[in-house]
Amino acid sequence: MSASEFDDRFVTVPLRDVTKVPSHERAGEAMNIIRQHLAKQFAVDEDAVRLDPSINDAVWSEGNNNPPRKLRVHAGSFAEDGETVVEADYEG
């Protein structure tokens, strides 16, 4: 794989919209917002975004009702089987 096929960046994902859903659904909605934000930043489908379990741990660290207001992730996109895939890790 050449360097031009790999796109690596740090992305800060704002999670302020998570307050628009009921408190008992906030951590799950935060995970959806992270996936949507990364898909938009890298211009791929949401199905092509792979989130590391460390992101899940960071979102759920304060429980379901109180996810963080923003999250910094390290994301990289690369070609796999002819499709672009994005993998993201928590940058804490």
UniProtKB/Swiss-Prot annotation:
Entries under SUPFAM superfamilies matching the protein: Ribosomal protein L31e (SSF54575)
Gene3D superfamilies: 3.10.440.10
Primary gene name: rpl31e
MF annotations from Gene Ontology: structural constituent of ribosome
NCBIfam families in the cross-refs: PRK01192.1-1 (NF002258)
UniProt-listed PANTHER family: 60S RIBOSOMAL PROTEIN L31
CDD domains for the chain: Ribosomal_L31e (cd00463)
HAMAP family: Ribosomal_eL31 (MF_00410)
A GO CC annotation given for this chain: cytosolic large ribosomal subunit
UniProt protein name: Large ribosomal subunit protein eL31
GO aspect biological process, one term: cytoplasmic translation
Keywords for this protein: Ribonucleoprotein, Ribosomal protein
InterPro entries given in the database record: Ribosomal_eL31, Ribosomal_eL31_CS, Ribosomal_eL31_dom_sf
Family, per entry: Belongs to the eukaryotic ribosomal protein eL31 family.
Pfam families: Ribosomal_L31e
